[in-house]
């Protein structure tokens, strides 16, 4: 959450520490978000989910992850003007992230 607040002030998001280590900003398609949260951010508080206009990103590449799925990776900073919406992801009583209404149809894992 703090990283995003800083990005909004500067106009540029350079990614999380994990993104910087990997050399790109990790993205997920809408239907991949629930699994990404479960796998990489279990019970993590103060998360912000960004909805981005991917058509305006020049350095976005789709690459295969270790689970075999294709994920978008941004090999540049993210200009905040390409962020269409932002959602806080509070935790429910079980420590599961509450999805915004737009993503609730994806709250179950997708078939592979």
PLM features per residue range, with description:
Residues 1-112:
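Conserved, structured core segments of small domains
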């Amino acid at each position: 959450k703090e990283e995003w607040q800083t990005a909004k002030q500067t106009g540029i998001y350079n990614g999380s520490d994990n993104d910087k280590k990997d050399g790109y900003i990790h993205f997920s398609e809408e239907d991949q978000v629930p699994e990404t949260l479960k796998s990489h951010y279990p019970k993590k508080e103060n998360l912000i989910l960004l909805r981005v206009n991917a058509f305006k990103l020049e350095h976005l590449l789709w690459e295969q992850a270790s689970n075999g799925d294709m994920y978008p990776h941004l090999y540049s900073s993210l200009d905040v003007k390409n962020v269409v919406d932002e959602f806080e992801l509070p935790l429910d009583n079980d420590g599961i992230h509450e999805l915004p209404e737009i993503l609730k149809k994806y709250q179950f894992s997708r078939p592979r």
